[in-house]
């Protein structure tokens, strides 16, 4: 299915999406993407519907053909301080701030958003499977976050982040129980607190 613009007009439409919200470790990433009105690619879809190879194939296409794109990052420490919902909004704000042009309309994947500088925004549940600018943002956010987890894995291979990317897999939780938490774990997340709590016989 070919994805569309939200409104067929001349406004600079920017799609925003995040990656890593449900993870136990690592930062949350967001991307903001302004695509040309005529942009089209047969593979473009929600990043969760694509293989890893397809996502990395699309990333340079998006980056080279877009009008502008930006990446925003919020650290685990910031997530613990302000909570993951606010951290997701902050990551999107930081991504928008990286754009070379000010957007005229924001498309947000999800049902909530903290308004950014009075730019009109539309929250769309499942927007990454419907609108191409959000789909493109989902691909950039996902691939750049995956890259960051691979880098962190070099210093903390015991957690298996090259496989689980920080998500709460059984192996990841088991590693937290065995080795304790790292500086990159989100200490306020229930999965981390539960896994790090000693078990009693």
Curated annotation (Swiss-Prot):
InterPro entries on file: RNase_HII, RNase_HII/HIII, RNase_HII/HIII_dom, RNaseH-like_sf, RNaseH_sf
Catalyzed reaction equations: Endonucleolytic cleavage to 5'-phosphomonoester
Positions contributing to a divalent metal cation binding: 17-18, 109
UniProt cross-references to SUPFAM superfamilies, sorted A to Z: Ribonuclease H-like (SSF53098)
Subcellular compartments: Cytoplasm
Enzyme Commission code: 3.1.26.4
Keyword terms: Cytoplasm, Endonuclease, Hydrolase, Manganese, Metal-binding, Nuclease
An annotated GO BP: DNA replication, removal of RNA primer
Cofactor(s) for this UniProt protein: Mn(2+); Mg(2+)
GO cellular component terms, semicolon-separated: cytoplasm; ribonuclease H2 complex
Major location category of this protein: cytoplasm
One Pfam family cited in the UniProt record for this chain: RNase_HII
GO molecular function: manganese ion binding; RNA binding; RNA-DNA hybrid ribonuclease activity
Domain RNase H type-2 as annotated: residue spans: 11-201
Transmembrane regions listed in the UniProt entry: none
Gene3D superfamilies, per the entry: Ribonuclease H-like superfamily/Ribonuclease H
Manner of cofactor binding, per the entry note: Manganese or magnesium. Binds 1 divalent metal ion per monomer in the absence of substrate. May bind a second metal ion after substrate binding.
Enzyme class: hydrolase
Family classification: Belongs to the RNase HII family.
Free-text function comment from the UniProt entry: Endonuclease that specifically degrades the RNA of RNA-DNA hybrids.
Protein name, UniProt field: Ribonuclease HII
Lineage: Bacteria, Pseudomonadati, Bacteroidota, Bacteroidia, Bacteroidales
Gene of this entry: rnhB
């Amino acid at each position: 299915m070919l994805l569309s613009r939200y409104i067929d007009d001349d406004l600079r439409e920017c799609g925003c999406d995040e990656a890593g919200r449900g993870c136990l470790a690592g930062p949350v990433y967001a991307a903001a993407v302004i695509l040309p009105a005529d942009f089209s690619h047969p593979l473009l879809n929600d990043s969760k519907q694509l293989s890893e190879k397809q996502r990395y194939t699309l990333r340079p296409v998006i980056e080279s053909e877009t009008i502008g794109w930006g990446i925003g990052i919020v650290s685990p420490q910031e997530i613990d301080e302000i909570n993951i919902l606010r951290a997701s909004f902050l990551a999107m704000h930081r991504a928008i701030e990286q754009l070379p042009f000010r957007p005229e309309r924001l498309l947000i994947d999800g049902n909530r958003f903290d308004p950014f500088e009075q730019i009109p925004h539309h929250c769309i549940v499942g927007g990454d499977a419907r609108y191409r600018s959000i789909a493109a943002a989902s691909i950039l956010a996902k691939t750049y976050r995956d890259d960051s987890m691979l880098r962190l894995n070099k210093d903390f291979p015991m957690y298996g982040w090259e496989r689980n990317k920080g998500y709460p897999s059984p192996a990841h939780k088991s590693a937290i129980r065995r080795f304790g938490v790292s500086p990159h774990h989100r200490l306020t997340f229930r999965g981390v607190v539960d896994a790090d709590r000693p078990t009693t016989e």
